[in-house]
UniProtKB/Swiss-Prot annotation:
Organism whose genome encodes this protein: Methanococcus maripaludis (strain C7 / ATCC BAA-1331)
Summary of the function given for this chain in its UniProt record: Catalyzes the attachment of proline to tRNA(Pro) in a two-step reaction: proline is first activated by ATP to form Pro-AMP and then transferred to the acceptor end of tRNA(Pro).
Encoding gene (name): proS
UniProt-listed GO biological process terms: prolyl-tRNA aminoacylation
Family label: Belongs to the class-II aminoacyl-tRNA synthetase family. ProS type 3 subfamily.
Gene3D superfamilies with a match to the protein in the record: Anticodon-binding domain, Bira Bifunctional Protein, Domain 2, C-terminal domain of ProRS
Enzyme Commission number(s): 6.1.1.15
Xref: NCBIfam families: proS_fam_I (TIGR00408)
Entry protein name: Proline--tRNA ligase
Length: 460
């Protein structure tokens, strides 16, 4: 089964997302999928809170004149804006945009709050719905008209040095987040023609899907003083002078969820990282006639023991065990514990890992400690496999001064190996003309194993 078909199929079978809503590019997070989303964004919120960010919530509606205030910024997506033009039957004097992103909204309010250097730094974030009128082929959780989980952070600083330090913090923070959810990535500095509109520069996180295409999963933008000058974000410096703040912004969306689903899944279904799994352990009682009560009593005891540390589900449905195994493998539950009469007699239980399929017999009297060890191994294995997967999709090619020869070499590598092709960095081919020659996207300038490369790939 091709990846595209597998992806659409697993969203339905595993109860992640239902795209049958009657608006293109809009769908519904189902309960199981929503829990994956919730646990993932809890990790992200914790990382932000621990680094001095404050969560907030801004309006969804943006007046047209406010959105248009930063001309270069709005040009980047003016064809994708949804507009509210009426209140009931009454035409509005000023059209209202459904939030495509929140720079203009937040910076209007920051002007009210920032007066002196002691008001800085200001580090805010929100997790909200955003709207883009996508005209391309929409894909669930990947390319949406309503992005249902957009975490955007916006910061303001007194100096360029503080602003640069914030970029480093954001990159480290996002790296830690993707490590936690076991999504591998490379970081690139986007080329000038592909940076965020209005930014000095953009750093981006990309991962690689099983079909060899890359997915942008996070961006970090250094805005310099560009937006501050437009929105008059001035403050009084310690020596009494006036200056504009320096700003950053950075975002992560539903693509993080799409990626953790896509990167580790297999022919059986999902393979979910432990920390974001709605159910971390599923208990399967093996019932035999005359032994039902003994088994159920013991497995309920086990359920109570494990629930002190893990999210556990006891599957006591009246169906065959094989059907239960299949159902929970589709949903990617990390560990399955089977318990039957013989296990009880022997003082044992059987643990099955979703990531490797390995079956491990453990002593029941020591089961909590054994589960903790296996969970730790599961986490480590998923991280190792994530790194291996992205390395297997990276190809370094030798530089050719002949642009046409180099482009043919890159196209051949993309065809044969897919993934990301790394070209030793050279200004002569770091341009849109080369991008057209290779019929792929220049992701940007990437450091890999201590060397600078131009990274190129076919993208979603």
């Amino acid at each position: 089964m091709e990846f595209s078909e597998w992806y659409s199929d697993i969203l339905e079978k595993a109860g992640i997302y239902d795209l049958r809503y009657p608006i293109k590019g809009c769908g519904v997070y189902l309960p199981y999928g929503f829990k994956i989303r919730r646990y993932s964004f809890e990790i992200l919120r914790k990382l932000l809170d621990e680094t001095g960010h404050d969560e907030t919530l801004f309006p969804m509606l943006i007046p047209e004149n406010l959105l248009a205030k930063e001309g270069e910024h709005i040009k980047g997506f003016e064809d994708e804006v949804f507009w509210v033009t009426h209140g009931g039957k009454t035409p509005l004097e000023v059209k209202l945009a459904l939030r495509p992103t929140s720079e203009t909204t937040m910076y209007y309010m920051m002007k009210q709050w920032i007066k002196v250097h002691t008001d800085l730094p200001l580090k805010l974030y929100q997790v909200v719905n955003t709207f883009r009128y996508e005209t391309k082929h929409t894909r669930p959780l990947i390319r949406l008209r309503e992005i249902m989980s957009f975490k955007e952070a916006h910061t303001a600083h007194a100096t360029k040095e503080d602003c640069d330090a914030q970029i480093k913090e954001a990159l480290n923070l996002y790296g830690e987040f993707f490590d936690e959810i076991c999504v591998p990535y490379i970081i690139s500095k986007r080329p000038e023609w592909d940076k965020f509109p209005g930014a000095d520069y953009t750093m981006a996180f990309d991962t690689i899907y099983p079909d060899g295409k890359t997915m942008q999963i996070g961006t970090v933008h250094n805005l310099g003083q560009n937006f501050a000058k437009t929105f008059e974000l001035e403050f009084e410096t310690p020596d009494g002078e006036k200056d504009f703040v320096y700003q950053t912004c950075y975002g992560i969306s539903d693509r993080a969820i799409a990626s953790l689903i896509s990167v580790h899944g297999d022919e059986k279904g999902l393979v979910i990282p432990v920390d974001v799994a709605p159910i971390q352990i599923v208990l399967i009682p093996l019932l035999f006639k005359g032994k039902e009560e003994i088994v159920m009593e013991k497995i309920k005891e086990l359920n109570s023991t494990l629930k002190s540390e893990f999210r556990v589900h006891l599957d006591d449905r009246d169906i065959r065990p094989g059907r239960k195994y299949n159902d929970w493998e589709i949903k990617g539950v990390p560990l399955r514990i089977e318990l039957g009469p013989r296990d009880i007699e022997n003082g044992q239980a059987l643990i099955v890992r979703r990531d490797t399929g390995e079956k491990i017999t453990v002593e029941y009297s020591n089961i909590l400690e054994e589960v903790e060890k296996i969970v730790s191994m599961y986490k480590e294995n998923l991280k190792i496999k994530a790194d291996e997967k992205i390395k297997n999709f990276l190809t370094v090619v030798d530089f050719e001064s002949d642009v046409n020869a180099l482009s043919e070499k890159v196209k051949a590598a993309l065809l044969e190996n897919k993934g990301i092709i790394l070209i030793p960095f050279d200004e002569s081919v770091y341009n849109e003309e080369f991008e057209e020659l290779i019929d792929a996207s220049v992701l940007g300038q990437t450091t890999y194993e201590g060397k600078d490369y131009i990274s190129v790939a076919r993208t979603y």
